[in-house]
Amino acid sequence: MKTIANESSLLDTKVPEPTLRRLPWYLSYVQLLHADGCESVSSTRIARAVGVDASLVAKDLSYVSVDGRTRVGYRVADMVAVLNDFLGFTHHHRAFLFGVGSLGAALLQDSGLRHFGLEIAAGFDVNPDIVDTNINGIPVYHKSRVAELCARERVDIGILTVPIRAAQSMADEMIAAGIKAIWNFTPWRISVPEGVVVQNTSMYAQLAVMFNRMKSLP
């Protein structure tokens, strides 16, 4: 049976979703400290840098194997290594991208994703002007080859950047081909069967939140 995908389906049930969303903030900050040669950092300093309460930082870090020392804090090098591993950034994941329009093409151009453990192995589209081309060294195929290439390349992550009207049908094709996790950039809440992970990243929703908050500005 299909259900509307909930973002929490992505998350480790042992770790609260807000915690998982904050951990990359901490990682970014301690990476800067590490680059500057800093050896230790307190939860108070981390909290001040990212704009949260120090007790929240300590609680969040209790879910990962980072040990802090009284009056010393956390070893920066250890935090960088542990957080990178815990968040999956040190592991190699391969993905296919579906919908090579302006957003999809931009993601294909973003080599920085590799630094977070994600390699986009191929793109898929139906536009004859795009199919059988390469973007940033990444081949673009017709979507009719999805099942064949998923099996051959053993890819189980899909990035969905198609127009909204095609979102559900493309998601269905992706899942039928063997995709087990979908990073959904469309504003459509796709329905998926049990056992398929979905992470919704709608820029339009974030834009709406920003516009709404701007209304309260003086």
UniProtKB/Swiss-Prot annotation:
GO terms for cellular component: cytoplasm. This is Redox-sensing transcriptional repressor Rex. InterPro entries: CoA-bd, NAD(P)-bd_dom_sf, Rex_DNA-bd_C_dom, Tscrpt_rep_Rex, WH-like_DNA-bd_sf, WH_DNA-bd_sf. SUPFAM superfamilies: NAD(P)-binding Rossmann-fold domains, Winged helix' DNA-binding domain. It comes from the Bacteria. The keyword Cell membrane does not apply. NAD(+) binds at G99, V100, G101, S102, L103, G104. Residues 25-64 bind DNA. Homodimer. The lineage of its organism: Bacteria, Pseudomonadati, Bacteroidota, Bacteroidia, Bacteroidales. One of its GO terms (molecular function) is DNA-binding transcription factor activity. It is found in: Cytoplasm. Keywords: Cytoplasm, DNA-binding, NAD, Repressor, Transcription, Transcription regulation. Belongs to the transcriptional regulatory Rex family. Pfam families: CoA_binding (PF02629), Put_DNA-bind_N (PF06971).
